[in-house]
Amino acid sequence: MTTIKVVKICGAMESRGLNPLDHLPPPASSNKPLTPFSITDILSKPTVKRFHRIHRLPASDRVRQSITVSRQTLITQASPLCALQELASKTFKGLELGVLQAAEGKDGLKLFGQRDSPKKRRKSRTAFTNHQLYELEKRFLHQKYLSPADRDQIAHQLGLTNAQVITWFQNRRAKLKRDLEEMKADVESVRSTGLVPLDKLAKLADLERCAAAGATGNPGPQCSPRLGHEYKTVHKLCLSPMSSLSDHTSQDCSEDEEVEIDVDV
């Protein structure tokens, strides 16, 4: 019967030119409001609506609603992205603090490890007088190594300390050794190209004699005198006051050979 009545009503309405769907009740509204899916609507609009609802609610309900919103805000702030941002911020703050402390000298050793110990300051070199150099060179010609008695005698005679005498003889032996090695290399290079000039052979022979003279610690023969230009050149090498001896700030003296030795006075 009900179906027949509905059909009759629909037929009567159609005969009058009316649409039966216009008289149907509106559909029940959904519990969840339809919202756009843009980032702005997702992040902003629900918060605005919540605040509008809070103002419309009574005072007691407003307090509860505000507590709920605060909890949701805390949950949002506790998201992984916020936690990562907070961790990065703390890390950079710690680094900035560490750099400032290191710049001010605070806890510098703890941050960057133990610092290297400062290098030992080199002692000032002695500038020998011409008289001292002459006597030292004359003694060096026939005695390359000094006994303790000879060392004390020279130091007392020239007004030097035992350490200064020892250091000078060490540097002088190193200088003679370098001169001899350079002369040998020069002779070998010339020999490979052809005949060796006699003056180079003469210089090499006299340098070897000077190196061998007094090498055992006992006085030996001096450089053998030669006539002509060869003897003058070699004698100049053996006797000339060198820049490394007159001014100990020069680099001619070997740094490896210059060793300070403790001497019992």
From Swiss-Prot:
It holds the Pfam family Homeodomain. This is Transcription factor LBX1b. Disruption phenotype: Morpholino knockdown results in decreased myod1 expression in the fin bud of embryos. The lineage of its organism: Eukaryota, Metazoa, Chordata, Craniata, Vertebrata. SUPFAM superfamilies: Homeodomain-like. GO terms for molecular function: DNA-binding transcription factor activity, RNA polymerase II-specific; sequence-specific double-stranded DNA binding. Signal peptide: none annotated. PANTHER family: TRANSCRIPTION FACTOR LBX (PTHR24336), TRANSCRIPTION FACTOR LBX1 (PTHR24336:SF9). It comes from the Eukaryota. It is found in: Nucleus. One of its GO terms (biological process) is convergent extension. Keywords: Developmental protein, DNA-binding, Homeobox, Nucleus. InterPro entries: HD, Homeobox_CS, Homeodomain-like_sf, HTH_motif, LBX_TF. Residues 121-180 bind DNA. SMART domains: HOX. Transcription factor required for the development of hypaxial muscles. The keyword Lipid biosynthesis does not apply. It comes from Danio rerio. One of its GO terms (cellular component) is nucleus.
